[in-house]
Structures are given as structure tokens and as C-alpha cells.
Regions:
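Membrane-interfacial amphipathic/re-entrant helices at transmembrane-helix boundaries
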Residues: 1, 37-43, 105, 111, ...
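Helix-loop-helix "hairpin" substructures at the membrane interface of multi-pass membrane proteins
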Residues: 55, 114-192, 200
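Transmembrane alpha-helical segments in multi-pass inner-membrane proteins
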Residues: 177-252
């Protein structure tokens, strides 16, 4: 699940998009509300992804059409989504403990335990999302989006509408994050209006860890780095919890990891200069 979320963040973190802190719980809120009302949990996942997509479009319009700075556009959407999420759920949280989810239905269908289903479902979703991303960003449209991220002025000089490319990139990334929120809500057994707090830090930690370890010299390497970084991050979190770290300190620990990873190149450069 974190791999899918990180893949979305990997597409947007260089554009300073804060929408994820709102689109993640939006996906969970939509999915939980639909499931509680008797809808299919699989349909609820699609609806959660669509909700994230709409959130990304809003941020994209604020940034490209209204010329609001990227980070502020994301923050404004994130703040607005807090109220939207409350309206979607009708309250601060929704329990899913006594209803069918994608995990319980998969366990029943394949005659496996819930723990096995909790591994299989995210693994399949990760594969499908990664395959789609690899294919899409290899198309002409996808390469235009990637080029816009690298050098907006150069792409604009080629006659490409960069505003449209940015909006498409934002709604794809936030659709992935909304999908992840829908899956996490079903796995946790509840959706909460505050479940998105710290999402961007967790995702960034996964992306940065993967990039530091593998390096990024191609698009496929970038995909692999995100997946590897997510796995390593979760292993590290499991280890520090096993060693006795209070769960309340996890966000602080994650923030420190991100700071160290971002500062490492500068520190390394100063050390080399000193030598």
C-alpha cells in the first residue's frame, strides 16, 4: 500500500504538492462511506481513486490557471478537503469492522487467511499500478508530462500545453494516493478524517531512501527505487518498534530520516571539500 502511495508522491514531490495530505483521507472517506452503505468494496476503491483524481485537478487548476504558487495551491486544497471529508463521512470516522472489505472477500474467494489476503491484495494492486505507470509514461503524452517536470520552458517552446501536462500529472498522482487511502481504510477497519496526517513525510521517506540506495538513471529504476524504498522504510519502522520506540514518535523518526537523506549530499560535499 505504501508502494502505491509513494509512487504517487514520486510523481509530484519535486513540484511541492501538498494535496496528498487531503486526497489520501478523501479516498478512505469515500470508500468507507460506500462500503458502510452496502456498496462493493472494489467499487469503493475505484471511487476513492476518482476522488483523489478530482482533488489533483483542483490543485492543478489553482496552480496553472489562477497562478497560485504550487505549494500554496496544494495546501489550500488540503485544507478544503478536511471539510469535504467530514461531509463525505458525515462524522469524524467510520468503522468497517463488521462489513465486507476487499481483504475479507479475497480471503473467502481464495480460501486463505486474512493475513495472506492482506499481502496479496496490495501486491496485486502494486503490480497493476506500476505496470500502468510504466506503460503510460512511455507513451507520447506520458513523456511530455515527464519532460514538463524536468524543463517546463523547453517543453513549452516545443508547442506543448504545459498547464495541461501539469494537471494530468497531478490528477494521476493523486488518484494513486486516493486509491491507497481507500485500501488502507479497508485494511485498518476504519476511515478517519485525520488519517492523512504525515502522509507526505512517509511517502517522501520511501522515495528518497529508494533513490539513495539504487540511484535514478532511468524511469524503470525510479519505479524500482520507490518500491524498494517503501519496503526498506517499513522494515526499519518494524525494527525500531520492536526495539521499543513509542509509536507516537514514528512521525518524528520519519522526519529525521527525510532530513538526513536530503542533507546527505550537502554534508558529503562539504566533507570532500574539507579533504
Amino acid at each position: 500500500r505504501d508502494d502505491v502511495e509513494s509512487r504517487g508522491l514520486g510523481d509530484v514531490y519535486k513540484r511541492q504538492d501538498m494535496t496528498c495530505e487531503g486526497s489520501f483521507p478523501l479516498g478512505g472517506a469515500i470508500a468507507a462511506s460506500m462500503i458502510a452503505a452496502g456498496a462493493s468494496p472494489w467499487l469503493a476503491i475505484a471511487a476513492g481513486a476518482f476522488g483523489g483524481l478530482l482533488a489533483g485537478i483542483v490543485t492543478g487548476i489553482l496552480y496553472t490557471k489562477l497562478k497560485i504558487p504550487a505549494i500554496l495551491a496544494g495546501i489550500l486544497t488540503m485544507i478544503a478537503l478536511y471539510s469535504v471529508n467530514l461531509h463525505v463521512m458525515g462524522k469524524a470516522n467510520i468503522s468497517l469492522l463488521r462489513v465486507d472489505t476487499i481483504f475479507s472477500t479475497t480471503a473467502s474467494l481464495l480460501h486463505v487467511s486474512n493475513s495472506v489476503a492482506a499481502f496479496l491484495v496490495p501486491a496485486v494492486l502494486l503490480f497493476l499500478c506500476s505496470a500502468f505507470i510504466y506503460w503510460f509514461f512511455g507513451t507520447e503524452l506520458g513523456m511530455c508530462i515527464r519532460a514538463t517536470g524536468y524543463n517546463t520552458q523547453m517543453v513549452r517552446a516545443q508547442g506543448v500545453n504545459t498547464d495541461t501536462m501539469i494537471i494530468i500529472g497531478l490528477f494521476i498522482s493523486n488518484a494513486l494516493i486516493g486509491l491507497c487511502g481507500a485500501v488502507v481504510a479497508q485494511n485498518n477497519g476504519f476511515a478517519d478524517v485525520g488519517m492523512g496526517i504525515g502522509t507526505i513525510i512517509i511517502g517522501l521517506a520511501s522515495v528518497i531512501i529508494g533513490e539513495v540506495i539504487l540511484g535514478v538513471d532511468s524511469f524503470s529504476a525510479s519505479l524500482a527505487a520507490v518500491i524498494l524504498g517503501s519496503v526498506i522504510y517499513r522494515v526499519v519502522i518494524a525494527v525500531v518498534l520492536y526495539m521499543g520506540m513509542p509509536p507516537n514518535d514514528l512521525k518524528l523518526f520519519t522526519a529525521i530520516i527525510v532530513v538526513l537523506a536530503l542533507a546527505a549530499p550537502m554534508i558529503k560535499g562539504k566533507v570532500n571539500v574539507g579533504k
